[in-house]
């Protein structure tokens, strides 16, 4: 005991404390318990690693999915953007046939075409032009690829003795269908035409426009496009009376694909409405106008520097860059400095519904403005027939009244009356002659001309479908100028015995008519025509 105590006391202080520390340490676990703990720890650690790997993979998968969604959304947005760009951009006005403002033909020939009813006699030195029938036949004879026609009437195959020209035209159209020439025709859905059905059976493509559903109106457009090169625009539809009984007027453009480039889009607009009962809220960019009143087509007409554009009605049918007919007429009247000559069948500034009639001032007010504010001379040549509205005389009297006691205010009005001249016809002529009517629809000034499909009646412009043509020329004195030719036609009719002043009950002097010479065979061969007055 003493020895152990001595040993402890003799030991160094550091050694004693170390031994005490070692003795105070807990006993180490047995090897078996150590192995179990190690295995448990390893298992937990492995599970934790697996969970972390799974979470990392899940994060990567979610991130990858998000990237795919973002990429897909970007691709869709890019595709939509490209589609919108290509639908919005119309490079240089190019159409589906590759025709564009860069490669179209703007050096054109233009000719007036007229339809002079049988028995309508002018003086020997009066101007005459190519007959409507011959002009149409010329176009069909020139056709090699396509014929596109818009017309409100399709009654060519009639049994009346004066319907022979209509029958010949119908036979020519049938012939073209067998020559691999593409025929496209547009008509109003109300047209019950055996001619259209016959042409359709032969392969012609026929589009019926439901103007009643679109705008409570009807189709009155009348124009042709042949081989994407030649154009007719005028008052006449494809009706045997337009080639026999009615006085019609229009123009034919030859080799004028620049004008076709624009007019073809109106035809395409009509065709796009096939089988549709409503007008789309937005028109395709391919139907936008190429030229309008702000951007006129620059061209040569019979080697005369000219400008031109086509207009459309109703306003519902005027996509972007397409001039409304009323605006086109405004531009012609506003540019007039000396005179405005207007030849239409009816003049009635009234908009009518089934329950009421309201004043429609659009054109009436423009005429008054030209008379009073700019001292432009105005002449109105209207038709007098059984459907002339009595209110027409009231409005004409009102127009004349505003020039009372106003210096340099000149308005003159005449009625072109072919019906009363039947009193001068022989018994044989009366037995087989249908009512004749002047259906011209044009205006000419000292620098421009407008040729359209409408009379100057409110409902025509607001509800019906029609196309107009405006031509501007600086040099209107040479005989090749279409504006001078149109002015000469107006003055020929104005000074003829068929044009009467505001006295609708006065009977004609038959003896004065017998002094006039009939048309020569050269000019009268194909000039007999007009429109069915029941459908005007």
From Swiss-Prot:
Gene Ontology terms, MF aspect: catalytic activity
Q: Which SUPFAM superfamilies match?
A: Phospholipase D/nuclease
Q: Where are the transmembrane segments?
A: 69-89
Q: Tell me the Pfam families matching this sequence.
A: PLDc_3
Establish whether keyword Transmembrane is in the entry.
yes
Topology class, membrane: Single-pass membrane protein
Going by the UniProt record, its keywords in alphabetical order are: Glycoprotein, Membrane, Repeat, Transmembrane, Transmembrane helix
Every copy of the PLD phosphodiesterase domain together lies at 215-242, 434-460
What this protein is called in its record is: Inactive phospholipase D5
Native source organism of the sequence:
Homo sapiens (Human)
- Could you tell me the gene encoding this protein? PLD5
